[in-house]
């Protein structure tokens, strides 16, 4: 099992699929990485040499923001919005949908379980 960017990637899968187990690398970026390192698309992780794994590791470290660094940057962006007092920051602070979705009837995932209101019967 190869360890890239602090993540154990599965050995029996194709390299493009296995790289997507790393937070911050999706299908497009995984394809880009394999092209930069000149690895065929059908190659599996257990068929990679140590040199190829090292090349992949170096490419990801040099060119991409992944795992903890990416999570930290996203949380810092949200914190910045909240500190500025921007509308999006206020929505984050109140734990409501940020991107304009309606909240009258939906948004249960973001708002949490419905809280009963005493005396609210029809």
Swiss-Prot record:
Region (Disordered): 92-122
PROSITE patterns per the UniProt record, alphabetical: RIBOSOMAL_S13_2
Keywords from the named record: Ribonucleoprotein, Ribosomal protein, RNA-binding, rRNA-binding, tRNA-binding
The keyword Isomerase appears for this protein: no
InterPro entries given in the database record: Rbsml_uS13_C, Ribosomal_uS13, Ribosomal_uS13-like_H2TH, Ribosomal_uS13_bac-type
GO molecular function: rRNA binding; structural constituent of ribosome; tRNA binding
Pfam families, per the entry: Ribosomal_S13 (PF00416)
A GO biological process held by the record: translation
Domain of life of the native organism: Bacteria
Function: Located at the top of the head of the 30S subunit, it contacts several helices of the 16S rRNA. In the 70S ribosome it contacts the 23S rRNA (bridge B1a) and protein L5 of the 50S subunit (bridge B1b), connecting the 2 subunits; these bridges are implicated in subunit movement. Contacts the tRNAs in the A and P-sites.
Family according to the record: Belongs to the universal ribosomal protein uS13 family.
Protein name as it appears in the record: Small ribosomal subunit protein uS13
Lineage: Bacteria, Pseudomonadati, Pseudomonadota, Alphaproteobacteria, Hyphomicrobiales
